[in-house]
């Protein structure tokens, strides 16, 4: 019973092995054909089956016999030069690894599934929306960074000596405070001095040149040199009410009286006519011994006395005479 039961199992295993061998034989013939085509070499396969059946590739016996004869004529060294079997192949690979123990094998850290399939296919539907939002956020950050780098590159390519932009001109104009400037126009016809309001918007070179030409301030600034005295001489303020006050540059006494009462002309008289400096003494301001070559009429000194008695004008005179500076009368 045992022998009979074992015979069908052995016959089935034998048939499976024969089928596997026949399949492998077809694969071997196919590989030999590919080697001859791709490598442009001559190759042949000689196969003997379990029952002694002979199979060759190529099927022409003459070609197989010729290749086998040439191979048999080679010496042993040439025969074993590229000859390898499974045992020899594994030993060769093992010895190669032992010769280079420090050599690192190249490994890929990427997941095979990520390379095969798209990334979004592995996410459930409820996680796809947060993933899209995260990607959009990163894209917006990259775009912003790109715009910043492009603008920085454009700024570097621009020349350094560029003209002023309107915003910089506005800033420069606003820095000129109009309250720090005063502009006076003197009329030689009626000997009057009037103050003109100047703002930062119209305080430019063309406007100022036109005012200089209209008021003839250039001629007025040249008068101290024509009259023959300089502005650095020291005069005593104790003689301001003297009847002998004279000046060859002034011929109209009514104009002098009107100009003295004017606040702006007082500044001009102290700076241009009198030529006084900050070291003058105020001790003898009401004395009658005041003299000045710029006033020709000695009878009309009452206007000068009236302007001196004015407390506001006295304070202004003290600021100029005692060294507080002329910054407010530029």
UniProtKB/Swiss-Prot annotation:
It is found in: Nucleus. CDD domains: MADS_SRF_like (cd00266). GO terms for cellular component: nucleus. PROSITE patterns: MADS_BOX_2 (PS50066). Keywords: DNA-binding, Nucleus, Transcription, Transcription regulation. One of its GO terms (molecular function) is DNA-binding transcription factor activity, RNA polymerase II-specific. Residues 19-61 form the MADS-box domain. SMART domains: MADS. Pfam families: SRF-TF (PF00319). The keyword Transcription regulation applies. GO terms for biological process: positive regulation of transcription by RNA polymerase II. Probable transcription factor that may function in the maintenance of the proper function of the central cell in pollen tube attraction. Interacts with MEE14/CBP1. This is Agamous-like MADS-box protein AGL75. It comes from Arabidopsis thaliana.
